A protein has these predicted regions:
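Cytoplasmic-side transmembrane-helix entry/capping segments in multi-pass membrane proteins
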Residues: 31-37, 80-88, 111, 137-144
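Helix-coil boundary and interhelical linker segments in multi-pass alpha-helical membrane proteins
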Residues: 1-5, 45-56, 96-109, 156-169
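Conserved small/polar residues in nucleotide/adenosyl-binding loops
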Residues: 201-207
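Active-site rim beta-loop-alpha module in soluble metabolic enzymes
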Residues: 125-161
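Small-residue-rich segments of transmembrane alpha-helices in multi-pass membrane proteins
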Residues: 37-48, 86-97, 141-154, 203
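C-terminal ends of transmembrane helices
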Residues: 17-28, 66-77, 124-133, 185-191
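Hydrophobic core of alpha-helical transmembrane segments in multi-pass integral membrane proteins
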Residues: 9-21, 42-43, 111-127, 148-154
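Interfacial loop-to-transmembrane junctions
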Residues: 189-200
Length: 209
């Protein structure tokens, strides 16, 4: 049984490598199915190794799978909206997991400082990209940007409360997600091209259980 559960992370590693190689080669016939398959395999790996699996983490990963599926057609506004909404709901699930599993005991000054830094970043990034984003998608894009910042801040605060490597990995995952979606936004709305970034948050958050 112990050997059997390693099938999932090994499969995930192989799948991730194949996906990255297909992105590098521009092979959409391989990139698209491997992208959609990533999150279910992450969920299986999480369930196999987590001491106390959380339904919220599993739900977040499955919403991520839906997001990946819809964003196979990112240049179509309807699918972009559905994909972004799916990821948004996934992040809500992650937030529920964070605030029901982590203890946060930090001075309010830290909360204000960290939040102010992220708020300033949102103002700068959104003000620069706003004109490139279709008007109908601007509210959703802003809400999603704020959600990514809330997720990142929500991972910093437990880390400041008590250091743990799992928290650090999850924080880096959220940071990769911010960077990945920044590239996605630039390619979609500025360069008008289909992006191929990988969602690292989904690969790192499950390490926390």
């Amino acid at each position: 049984m112990i050997v059997l559960k390693w099938v999932f992370p090994v499969s995930l590693a192989v799948l991730a490598i194949v996906h990255l190689v297909s992105c590098w080669r521009g092979d959409d016939d391989l990139r698209k199915p491997t992208k959609v398959a990533l999150m279910p395999v992450v969920a299986l790996s999480y369930l196999a190794f987590a001491r106390q699996p959380s339904i919220w983490v599993v739900a977040g990963l499955l919403f991520g799978c839906l997001g990946d599926l819809f964003l196979l057609w990112p240049l179509k506004k309807k699918f972009f909206a559905l994909g972004t909404s799916s990821f948004f709901l996934g992040h809500v699930c992650y937030l529920i997991f964070i605030y029901t599993h982590y203890v946060i005991r930090v001075s309010w000054i830290w909360i204000v400082v960290v939040s102010a830094i992220y708020a300033a970043g949102v103002v700068v990034v959104y003000s620069r990209s706003r004109k490139s984003i279709p008007r109908a998608l601007r509210p959703l894009s802003l809400m999603y940007m704020l959600m990514l910042c809330v997720l990142s801040v929500s991972l910093i605060l437990p880390l400041l409360t008590a250091f743990w490597w799992g928290k650090l990995v999850a924080f880096f995952g959220a940071t990769f997600f911010l960077a990945s979606d920044g590239v996605l936004c630039d390619m979609l709305f500025v360069k008008k091209a289909e992006p191929t970034p990988v969602s690292y948050t989904h690969l790192t958050l499950p390490t926390n259980s």
